[in-house]
A protein has these predicted regions:
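Glycine-rich phosphate/pyrophosphate-handling loop used in enzymes and phosphotransfer proteins
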Residues: 1-211
Length: 211
């Protein structure tokens, strides 16, 4: 029996013992996301008109920018988010981040590419970089969820991924617990770029949620 047949048998046994489930309702689903949850996700999509800076949904086209972006200077050109952070998305992301559901990240990435491939290709990023975790947090969790997203997006779009050059220099408080000004203060001097990094024109920065 050759290796391909052995691997297929292994995969069949694994799928029987641990069947793939929808990341949003945990029902067994071989297609990734079940039909019922796809309907819910369609309603949770961040739609146009979007803020021209951060990508959040805004009330009218004439507005152009959300309130936060009109009063805050950002160090990036444009942000994009796929879904609003509401149930079942927020519960699914929580499982992805804190309960070792790494497969969810692959499914999220596939959905992100479906929605934003043309936009990303228009940006022509030289590399993709995941937002890093502090080493102690990564050791505790076992993985960086943003890195899973970045690597899958890079694989699909054939864009190099650099997950080593951007580093977290100090531990920070969870952003979701902080107000706007506290978030800015929390992240100040929290990141650095290694001196070995060779500068490029465009970087696609990836994280699991926008705060």
């Amino acid at each position: 029996m050759n290796h391909k047949k052995i691997n297929k048998i292994k995969e069949s046994i694994i799928s029987l013992l641990w069947p793939e489930v929808c990341p949003f309702c945990q029902k067994v689903c071989r297609d990734g996301i079940c039909k019922e949850c796809r309907k819910k996700l369609e309603l949770l999509k961040v739609r146009e008109p979007r803020c021209m800076q951060c990508g959040k949904q805004i009330r009218s086209v004439e507005q152009e920018y959300c309130y936060d972006c009109m009063h805050t200077h950002h160090y990036y050109e444009r942000g994009l988010s796929l879904w609003n952070h509401k149930n079942p998305v927020n519960q699914s992301v929580y499982q992805f981040k804190y309960h070792n559901q790494r497969r969810y990240g692959i499914l999220y990435s596939q959905e992100l590419v479906k929605e934003f491939q043309k936009e990303i290709e228009r940006w022509r990023p030289d590399i993709i970089m995941p937002v890093p975790l502090h080493p102690s947090r990564k050791r505790k969790r076992g993985y960086n969820q943003a890195q899973i997203l970045a690597e899958e997006i890079g694989k699909i779009l054939e864009i190099p991924v650099d997950s080593k050059s951007l580093i977290r220099t100090r531990k920070t408080s969870p952003q979701k617990k902080l107000g706007h000004q506290e978030r800015k203060k929390n992240l100040k001097h929290a990141f650095a770029v290694k001196h070995t990094f060779q500068a490029v024109k465009r970087v696609l920065l990836v994280d699991d949620i926008y705060t």
